[in-house]
């Protein structure tokens, strides 16, 4: 009887831990490495190890330059991630809109960039923002859309999806048109997907779900973000957004934290726990 009670006690203690492990196995959640940029500069290998131990399953890089990722070759970066149970899903990088004279050199830059990402095993390359030309006239924004279509075609040839990440300025009007709508209407869905930042669209005064209804299947990646750690501000109502994930075309969710109540590593761990515990995150 005593032995039976002891076994039951072990089972009761173990069950919650098993549930947590099961959640981590079932939910695939990525981390934007910009969230831990200082840690990556100090100790990339140690930081990646900690992120894998937290339960993140993939990363979005923010450290590409000159054919390398955080100073590592594409193969070395991929090996580091895989050794820690992580995959390389996406990367923030990009090049400003070139003038006609700079077009060929810019396309060569993209060729090197795309090749490096293909060698590292990335699925997505995301341009994180535009320079001031993109926030000027609709004529300049149209040039950006044409540019993105050209880059997206190059990415497609290497089996990579190209996309654009918003801040709040994309939801301002120019010449009677909301910039973000103009971009969605003037980019080819086969060449350009959109990474919707859920916090910045809220700051821009728009509803994510309204965009899902109007432009279904265009939002393959999401930045799940709050003012600080996820759930901290009380301003973000994530549940109705996640309920429209299929309509949006969402394939992967990525945590990003840029302002912190704790150390960056603790902040991203708390944010991961928030999503792990959220029943609407599948």
Regions flagged by a language model, labelled:
Residues 23-33, 40-54, 121, 175-196, ...:
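Histidine-acidic metal/acid-base catalytic patches
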Residues 1-5:
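Positively charged n-region of N-terminal signal peptides that target proteins for export
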Residues 7, 21-123, 217, 273, ...:
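N-terminal pre-domain/capping segments
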């Amino acid at each position: 009887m005593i032995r039976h009670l002891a076994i039951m006690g072990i089972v009761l203690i173990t069950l919650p831990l098993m549930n947590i492990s099961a959640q981590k196995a079932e939910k695939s959640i990525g981390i934007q490495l910009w969230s831990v940029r200082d840690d990556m500069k100090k100790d990339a290998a140690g930081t990646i190890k900690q992120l894998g131990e937290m339960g993140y399953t993939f990363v979005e890089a923010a450290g590409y330059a000159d054919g390398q990722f955080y100073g590592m070759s594409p193969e070395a970066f991929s090996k580091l991630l895989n050794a820690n149970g992580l995959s390389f899903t996406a990367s923030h990088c990009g090049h400003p809109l070139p003038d006609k004279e700079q077009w060929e050199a810019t396309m060569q830059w993209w060729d090197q960039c795309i090749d490096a990402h293909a060698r590292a095993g990335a699925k997505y390359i995301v341009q994180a923002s535009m320079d001031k030309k993109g926030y000027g006239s609709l004529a300049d924004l149209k040039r950006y859309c044409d540019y993105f279509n050209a880059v997206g075609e190059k990415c497609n040839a290497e089996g990579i999806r190209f996309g654009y990440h918003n801040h709040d300025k994309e939801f301002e009007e120019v010449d009677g048109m909301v910039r973000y709508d103009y971009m969605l209407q003037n980019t080819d869905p086969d060449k350009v997907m959109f990474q919707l930042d859920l916090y910045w669209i809220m700051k821009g005064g728009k509803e994510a779900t309204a965009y899902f209804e109007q432009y279904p299947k265009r939002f393959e990646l999401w930045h799940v973000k709050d003012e600080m750690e996820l759930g901290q501000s009380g301003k973000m109502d994530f549940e109705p957004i996640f309920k429209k994930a299929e309509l949006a075309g969402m394939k992967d969710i990525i945590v990003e934290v840029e302002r912190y109540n704790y150390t960056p590593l603790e902040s991203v761990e708390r944010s991961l726990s928030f999503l792990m515990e959220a029943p609407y995150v599948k």
